[in-house]
């Protein structure tokens, strides 16, 4: 029997369990709703961004019901990553029937404990999340780490998919040569995921969003610096995440993250917000300790912040992460996909001189498109003129990592995007500048390139040879 199995057998003497939520100095305590956690002898934060195993010694989902913790399902060698359906009746999870199996996606009906396999592939499929309109998404292990994919969830659709060109069937949502791992589905229908920054190149964890058809990828905020991961959206619309040793949030009025004054601890990320606004979260005292489920009331909610974290569930020698409340929740908006049935995409830049890193002083004369093939080799696909106001309009390859390079009149590099992004087949995208940040709006004017022509410069059939200058010029 492995360490996890032994720990769960002795669960009655190894558990610290506080079955109440709404903890305060008053007597009006509320019973905590049932919740699910992933229990593992070892949880390795951020292993997913290296394409590695987060639970190298196995894991098991526990259901905490009326103050008692027990395995959520039977007959599995390993289970993890619970996501409760919007009506609170079903649970998606990653599971292995035998230890040698890859992770696959399963669904549990809570009322009768019926389990069915939802997704089966040759490799690991992890972190499933429900999407509206009868679909789900997950992280698929690939040669480049994890990539996000989506598919029908197997239920009779209550609503048709809003654009047939984006489904049905299995649909890849990310197209970059680096791990992308989902963390939440936002209220507006976008998918929140973590990857490294710069995207496709860097090593600093960052939070990004993408629509349910794989279009519109962007970083959530552009105040890049410290690593942040484990993002979850609250009922208020704020997104809470962890730096590891601290918590912070993205809130609508601010273009940069807002620190959260939380008790000193290491936070795993992925909180669960109760109806009263309190948080169930996974935290530990330090690197040598194990994660436990704690309860905390942040100071910016209706209840005053607690002086310390209250332990709700702890198991000796076991990490407890990913709390998920078993309760109905608001269904996110469906994304009305605007993709066309094309094998290319159009991109309009309003002012390529603008950047979050500082505007380009020397006016760019042209822009070069670079694309990364399946082997990671960079090829230059051609150039397009940049207008005096910084605008350009191009037709680009779709569903592949791309980036732009600004050139002066002599063809020398003024600035190259540090990372990569993709644009979906049939997508028509407008950018304010080059990595300006979602908080920056465009000037109220017609871009000069559209006054000259409404035909995009075709950069889809450029040179296929590797770009010899890319390595020498640096990123």
Where are these regions (language model features)?
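Residue position within the beta-strands of beta-propeller blades
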Residues: 35-46, 90-94, 136-141, 191-195, ...
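Sequence context surrounding c-type heme c attachment/ligation sites in exported
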Residues: 316-319, 388-475
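Asp-box/WD-like beta-propeller blade repeats and closely related beta-sheet repeat scaffolds
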Residues: 102-104, 114-161, 169-179
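Conserved beta-propeller blade repeats
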Residues: 76-86, 90, 122-135, 177-194, ...
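Short, acidic Ser/Thr/Gly-rich low-complexity loop/linker segments typical of extracellular
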Residues: 70-74, 376-389
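Structural motif
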Residues: 58-60, 100-106, 146-161, 201-208, ...
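C-type cytochrome heme c attachment motif
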Residues: 106, 137-138, 161, 190-194, ...
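Multi-bladed beta-propeller domains
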Residues: 65-78, 109-124, 161-178, 211-227, ...
């Amino acid at each position: 029997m492995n360490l996890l199995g032994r720990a769960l057998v002795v669960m009655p003497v190894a558990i610290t369990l506080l079955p109440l939520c709404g903890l305060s100095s008053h007597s009006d305590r509320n019973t905590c709703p049932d919740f699910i956690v992933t229990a593992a002898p070892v949880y390795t934060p951020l292993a997913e961004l290296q394409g590695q195993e987060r639970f190298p010694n196995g894991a098991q989902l526990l259901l905490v019901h009326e103050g008692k913790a027990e395995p959520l399902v039977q007959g599995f060698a390993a289970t993890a990553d619970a996501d409760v359906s919007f009506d609170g009746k079903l649970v998606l999870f990653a599971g292995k029937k035998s230890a040698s199996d890859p992770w696959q996606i399963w669904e549990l009906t809570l009322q009768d404990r019926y389990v069915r396999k939802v997704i089966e592939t040759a490799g690991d499929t992890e972190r499933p999340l429900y999407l509206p309109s009868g679909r789900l998404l997950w992280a698929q292990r690939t040669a480049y780490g994890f990539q996000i994919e989506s598919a029908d969830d197997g239920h009779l659709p209550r609503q048709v998919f809003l654009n047939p060109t984006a489904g049905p069937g299995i649909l890849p949502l990310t197209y970059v040569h680096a791990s992308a791992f989902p963390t939440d589905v936002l209220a507006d229908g976008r998918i929140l995921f973590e990857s490294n920054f710069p995207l496709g190149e860097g090593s600093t964890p960052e939070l990004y969003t993408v629509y349910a058809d794989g279009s519109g990828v962007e970083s959530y905020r552009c105040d890049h610096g410290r690593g942040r991961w484990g993002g979850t959206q609250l009922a208020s619309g704020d997104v809470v995440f962890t730096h590891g040793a601290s918590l912070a949030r993205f809130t609508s009025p601010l273009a940069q993250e807002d620190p959260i004054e939380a008790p000193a601890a290491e936070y795993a990320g992925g909180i669960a917000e109760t109806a009263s606004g309190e948080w169930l979260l996974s935290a530990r005292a330090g690197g040598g300790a194990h994660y436990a489920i704690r309860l905390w009331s942040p100071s910016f909610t209706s209840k005053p912040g607690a002086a310390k974290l209250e332990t709700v569930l702890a198991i000796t020698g076991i990490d407890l992460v990913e709390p998920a409340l078993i309760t109905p929740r608001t269904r996110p908006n469906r994304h009305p996909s605007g993709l066309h049935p094309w094998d290319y995409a159009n991109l309009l830049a309003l002012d390529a001189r603008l950047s979050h890193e500082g505007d380009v002083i020397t006016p760019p004369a042209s822009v070069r498109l670079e694309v990364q093939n399946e082997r990671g080799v960079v090829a230059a696909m051609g150039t397009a003129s940049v207008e005096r106001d910084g605008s350009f309009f191009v037709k680009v390859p779709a569903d592949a990592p791309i980036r732009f390079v600004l050139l002066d009149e002599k063809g020398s590099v003024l600035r190259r995007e540090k990372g990569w992004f993709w644009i979906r087949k049939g997508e028509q995208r407008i950018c304010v500048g080059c990595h300006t940040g979602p908080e920056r709006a465009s000037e109220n004017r017609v871009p000069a390139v559209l006054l000259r022509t409404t035909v995009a410069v075709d950069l889809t059939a450029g040179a296929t040879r590797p770009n010899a200058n890319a390595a020498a010029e640096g990123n």
